[in-house]
Amino acid sequence: RVRSSAASDVYKRQTLACAEAGASVSHVDASKGMVQWARENATVSGLSDKPIRWLVDDCEKFVQREIRRGKTYDAIVMDPPSYGRGPGGEIWKLEDCIYDLVKTCSGVLSDEPLFFLLNSYTTGLSPSVMAYILRDVLGTRFGGNVTADEIGLPVEATGGVLPCGSTAIWQK
């Protein structure tokens, strides 16, 4: 079974896709409202009976606890925010924190992980930088391949694609 630790999943669809594919999912987001929205999407999508743990928590702290508990995951889908403030006023900025977050999350991966998907919707993190991070953190430990590209929204009026972020995936 595949389990996925998801950070902020913009449309909450990645969690549902993993659950629909048969995974046991831990959906982690620091925002109670986002977790509620994701849970509602699961219900509307007919997936409320799937094994999804809905957790309102700081993703990095959650992962650190899972490591201490000896829990492992076969896959991680990460969709972190560009910027955030913690309850104690801590500032989290994607460009400054992403490498360490990926490194921390790699510690909860099983011995035979399947994939690690990283999405970003900030202009400060290009596909090549994201690929480098995944290759450096995961490729050295597990081998595998990394691919990266832009994320875009189709524009019906022009037939073009409006770039809106980046994605990178490491897979075995």
Q: Predicted segment positions?
A:
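Mobile active-site "lid"/loop adjacent to the S-adenosyl-L-methionine
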Residues: 56, 74-104
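C-terminal catalytic and target-recognition region of SAM-dependent MTase-like enzymes
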Residues: 113-172
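Conserved SAM-binding loop of SAM-dependent methyltransferases across substrates and taxa
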Residues: 13-23
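Conserved SAM/SAH-binding beta-strand->alpha-helix loop
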Residues: 31-33
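Single conserved hydrophobic/aromatic residue that forms the stacking wall/gate
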Residues: 1-7, 11
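S-adenosyl-L-methionine
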Residues: 35-75
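Helix-to-beta-strand junctions that scaffold the AdoMet/dcAdoMet cofactor pocket
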Residues: 109-111
